[in-house]
């Protein structure tokens, strides 16, 4: 019986540590992580265009314009030709929004040719649906709605 209890409580303890670690990673590490990948489409030519894509900023009280500043600085260090934001600017616009500071931060993004934005699922609902396009346009982004640019 004692052996069973040791195994049982050892298993429960291990599961609690594992679950706690996953929750900690999901809320405290992953949201602040920046990943960078470089893809080469044609190695036979010296012509290239650098595109930086970012998304899912999910701005909220504990990830605000100060955190966005770090992302903007990282983007600008890449010297992009084109920047594409693929949606989900705010986490929940009805609960938290700081448009003035967010616009100022997004305006700092430098791109040689264009800054492009598309809508994410969190940009289409709630108060964000009425503000997203305006925020991105004031930030210097071309907002696409089921359309293309270029050829």
What name fits each language-model region?
Residues 1-45:
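N-terminal membrane-anchoring alpha-helices
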Residues 47-142:
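Membrane-embedded segments
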Residues 145-149:
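A substrate-binding/cap region within the structured catalytic cores of diverse enzymes
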Residues 32-34, 140-144:
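Short solvent-exposed loop/turn micro-motifs enriched in small/polar/acidic residues
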């Amino acid at each position: 019986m004692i052996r069973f209890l040791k195994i049982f409580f050892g298993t429960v303890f291990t599961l609690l540590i594992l679950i706690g670690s996953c929750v900690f990673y999901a809320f405290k590490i992953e949201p602040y992580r920046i990943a960078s990948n470089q893809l080469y489409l044609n190695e036979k030519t010296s012509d290239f265009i650098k595109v930086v894509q970012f998304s899912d900023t999910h701005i909220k009280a504990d990830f605000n314009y100060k955190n966005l500043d770090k992302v903007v600085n990282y983007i600008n260090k890449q010297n992009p030709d084109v920047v594409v934001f693929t949606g989900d600017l705010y986490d929940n616009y009805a609960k938290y929004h700081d448009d003035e500071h967010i616009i100022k931060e997004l305006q700092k993004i430098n791109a040689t040719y264009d800054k492009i934005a598309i809508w994410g699922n969190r940009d289409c609902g709630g108060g964000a649906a009425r503000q997203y396009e305006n925020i991105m346009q004031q930030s210097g982004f071309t907002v696409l709605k089921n359309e293309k640019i270029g050829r």
